[in-house]
């Protein structure tokens, strides 16, 4: 199985999304799709994502915005990843 999640995004916008909308921002493999990203987040963080939005940045990286369920706090996952 290929590595789907490459690294978390550590920008101010990513932290603001964690605090306000319970969304974590990740850089993922360019070839991965939304269902693979959901499975990777579910297995890595033991939480079920509600929604995944993706985009390809001008630097040719794929960025995924993963909205977590309300029973999971994105700030806890951010602290675990070292974003906060």
Task: Label each residue range with its predicted role.
Residues 1-84:
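Contiguous, often N-terminal, cationic amphipathic patches that form binding interfaces
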């Amino acid at each position: 199985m290929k590595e789907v999640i490459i690294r978390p995004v550590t920008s101010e916008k990513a932290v603001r999304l964690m605090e306000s909308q319970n969304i974590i921002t990740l850089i993922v493999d360019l070839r991965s799709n939304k269902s693979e990203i959901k499975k990777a987040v579910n297995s890595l963080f033991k939480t079920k994502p509600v929604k995944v939005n993706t985009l390809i940045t001008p630097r040719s990286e794929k960025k995924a915005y993963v909205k977590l369920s309300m029973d999971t706090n994105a700030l806890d996952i951010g602290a675990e990843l070292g974003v906060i």
